[in-house]
């Protein structure tokens, strides 16, 4: 039986971002209207650490639904707080889509190979 859990490629430095709340909710007051905007904006993280990632994986309900190659990182104000965001391109096809990711605790950001 094939393992359906994420097994990272050794050279990939990965950030997994749990977007279950924003992606599934589709709050009409939220400006994130598509998958890319759900995953790229408003993260609390160390931007210097984030800049070392060569892959960003969007995770909803424990399953990877998209993979991106970040091209740049920056800060943005959101609801009065400074948050990180990235600009990048989607990777299609992806070896990671459909794989499961487990999170411990409540942090929606998970670093792998970093």
Give the residues covered by each predicted segment.
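Short beta-strand element of the conserved SAM-dependent methyltransferase core
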Residues: 17, 68, 87-91
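Short, solvent-exposed secondary-structure boundary/capping segments
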Residues: 75-90
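Compositionally biased, charged N-terminal/linker segments
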Residues: 1-53, 60-62, 93-95, 100-114
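Positively charged, phosphate-engaging catalytic surfaces used for nucleic-acid and nucleotide handling
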Residues: 57-59, 80
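Acidic, aromatic-enriched beta-alpha/helix-loop junctions
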Residues: 51-55, 84-86
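Short conserved micro-motifs at the rims of enzyme active sites and ligand-binding pockets
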Residues: 69, 79-80, 97-100
């Amino acid at each position: 039986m094939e393992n359906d859990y994420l097994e990272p490629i050794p050279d990939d430095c990965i950030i997994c971002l749990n977007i279950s709340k924003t992606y599934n909710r589709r709050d009409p007051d939220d400006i994130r209207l598509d998958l890319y905007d759900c995953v790229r904006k408003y993260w609390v993280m160390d931007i210097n650490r984030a800049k070392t990632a060569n892959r960003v994986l969007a995770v909803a309900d424990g399953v990877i639904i998209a993979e991106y190659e970040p091209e740049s990182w920056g800060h943005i104000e959101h609801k009065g707080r400074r948050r990180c965001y990235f600009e990048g391109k989607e990777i299609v096809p992806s070896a990671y889509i459909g794989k499961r990711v487990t999170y411990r605790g409540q942090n929606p950001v998970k670093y792998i190979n970093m």
